[in-house]
Structures are given as C-alpha cells and as structure tokens.
Amino acid sequence: MKSSNKKKQINATLIDYGEGIFAIDSGYIRKEFAAIHLVVERNKVAVIDTGTNFSVANVLEALKTLNLTKHSVEWIFLTHIHLDHAGGAGKLMSVFPTARLAVHSRGVKHMINPKKLWDAVINVYGLKTALQQYGEIIPIPGDKIVEVGAGD
C-alpha cells in the first residue's frame, strides 16, 4: 500500500491520516494536547488509548462521523495505564459490548480493580481535581481483558 502524507481535518476533534488511521482529540487539559487513535479496516475498529471518561463522547462522535457502530469496535489497546491514556477504558468497555481490552500484564490488575491506581491519583491531585480531570475510574471485568507482555 502506498502511504499518503496528507492529513485531513474532518471536524474539530477528528483527523484522518489516511489508510484507516484516525486521531481523535481527547479533550484532555486543552485542545490538541492528547489524542486517541482509531485503526479502521473493513468496518472493524481498534481504539488505541482511551483518554479519560470525558473523552468517551468524542470517541462516540468520531465513530458516528465515520458511519461505524459500537459493535464495530473489536479491540481497545492501552499503551500504558496513566489516566490520561487509560482512564476512560472502563467507560468505553461498557459502551462497546463485543470489545476486548489489551493491556500490559502489569496493568491488568489495575483495570480489574482500579482502587490502588485511583487512590494514588487522589493522593497526588486531591479528590476534587482527580474527579474534574479524569472522572471516577470504572473497573473492567477480567474476562474482557487480554494480558500482553514483551514481544506480544
């Protein structure tokens, strides 16, 4: 496949990089500060990182804009479990009934039971700021998670 270096701004929060690769502005902190990525092939979608709970609306809007449904999302991949990248994972998993979550083996326990992660965030930011920045973290059932490690 020949690569295209042209990016196309579809709307205020969605960029098309071509060949089924899209970036969604997560809305975290300020405009164009952090992105969620979609990889789309044959109407099947992989979401790379989730942003925060407040990013979910932008993901759903992007899918609608691309004429995709919540059943199109097969995978959510987390690059790491910092809340600006993975804080919305539980909420997104609840929206996408057939999706599976791929996360590094060290992050699995925190996605199943985010209490330790959430407590650490509250310790750093305080409860009010943590809720304003990330929203409350939603646990993910273990049977929806695929553990990945080095080399996977």
Predicted stretch roles:
Residues M1-I15:
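Basic/polar N-terminal segments that are highly enriched at the extreme N-terminus
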Residues A35, N58, G88, N113-P114:
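Residues at alpha-helix caps and immediate loop-helix transition turns in enzyme cores, especially N-
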Residues F22, A102, I145-V148:
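General small-molecule cofactor/ligand-binding pocket signal
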Residues M111-D152:
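Metallo-beta-lactamase
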Residues N11-L66:
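Conserved beta-strand hairpin/beta-sheet module of binuclear metal-dependent hydrolase folds
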Residues R106-H110:
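Short histidine/acidic/glycine/proline-rich micro-motifs that form metal-
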Residues A57-V103:
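Active-site metal-binding motif and surrounding structural segment of the metallo-beta-lactamase
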